[in-house]
C-alpha cells in the first residue's frame, strides 16, 4: 500500500530542508512552504505568492518590539517569507537557541504572542495572524487551509499537526481537513 506524502509548514524552503533534511523533503510529493504560499514539487517551484507587508504593518510590529519587556533580543525580528512574514520578539538571529527556552517560559506566563496577535487582528482585520512555532507569529493574507484546493473531495487526508488549537497556525487546515477530507492527529512532541 503506497501513500502520497505532502508536507505543510510555516517555514520557508531553506528552513524546512534544515529541519527535516533534504532526503525527506525530496520524498514528499509536494511541499507547501510558508503555509502554502511557496509550493515545490521536488526541486521545481510551482507557485509563489507575491504578498508583501505594508509599511504600516512593519511600523506596528516595530512598536510591539519596543513595547515588549522581554530582555533578550537576537535580531531578525521580522523575517520576510514568500507570501508572509514571521514576527518574533526574541528574533531569529544569532544566539536564538540561547533565548528560546527563556522566551517560551515568558510567553507561557505573559501570553505575549496571543496578546500581540489580538492587537494585530484588531488593527489589520484583513490579515491572518497565527501563533507559530515556539517564539513567533505567522502573518499573511492567507493560512494553511489554502492548500485544501489541491485535493479532491474523494481524497483521504490524514493531517498531523502540533499547533492545532484555535489561533495557532495548524488550526485552519485541521478544521478544513475535518470538514472535507479526513482525519487529524494532534502531535505533542
Q: Can you say where each PLM-predicted feature lies in the sequence?
A:
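Acidic, Mg2+-coordinating phosphoryl-transfer loop and its flanking beta/alpha structural elements
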Residues: 9, 87, 148, 154-189
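Short beta->alpha linker loops
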Residues: 11-12, 82, 143, 188-189
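Conserved acidic, metal-coordinating active-site core of Asp-based
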Residues: 71-158, 166
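Residues at the C-termini of beta-strands that transition into short coil/loop
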Residues: 32-35, 133, 188
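Active-site phosphate-binding/coordination module
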Residues: 1-77
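A generic structural motif
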Residues: 2-4, 125-129, 155, 179-183
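Short glycine/serine/threonine-biased micro-segments
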Residues: 8, 34, 130-131, 159
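Alpha-helix C-terminal capping segments
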Residues: 1-3, 20-24, 64, 119-124, ...
Amino acid at each position: 500500500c503506497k501513500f502520497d506524502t505532502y508536507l505543510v509548514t510555516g517555514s520557508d524552503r531553506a528552513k524546512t530542508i534544515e529541519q527535516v533534511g533534504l532526503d525527506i523533503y525530496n520524498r514528499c510529493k509536494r511541499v507547501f512552504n510558508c503555509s502554502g504560499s511557496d509550493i515545490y514539487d521536488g526541486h521545481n517551484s510551482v507557485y509563489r505568492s507575491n504578498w508583501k507587508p505594508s509599511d504600516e504593518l512593519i511600523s506596528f510590529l516595530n512598536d510591539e518590539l519596543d513595547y515588549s519587556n522581554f530582555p533578550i533580543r537576537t535580531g531578525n525580528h521580522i523575517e520576510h517569507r514568500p507570501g508572509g512574514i514571521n514576527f518574533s520578539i526574541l528574533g531569529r538571529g544569532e544566539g536564538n537557541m540561547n533565548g528560546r527556552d527563556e522566551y517560551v517560559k515568558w510567553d507561557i506566563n505573559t501570553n505575549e504572542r496571543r496578546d500581540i496577535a489580538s492587537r494585530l487582528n484588531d488593527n489589520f482585520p484583513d490579515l491572518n495572524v497565527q501563533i507559530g512555532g515556539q517564539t513567533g507569529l505567522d502573518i499573511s493574507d492567507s493560512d494553511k487551509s489554502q492548500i485544501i484546493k489541491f485535493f479532491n473531495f474523494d481524497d483521504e487526508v490524514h493531517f498531523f499537526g502540533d499547533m492545532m488549537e484555535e489561533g495557532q497556525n495548524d488550526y485552519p487546515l485541521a478544521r478544513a481537513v475535518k470538514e472535507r477530507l479526513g482525519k487529524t492527529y494532534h502531535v505533542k512532541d
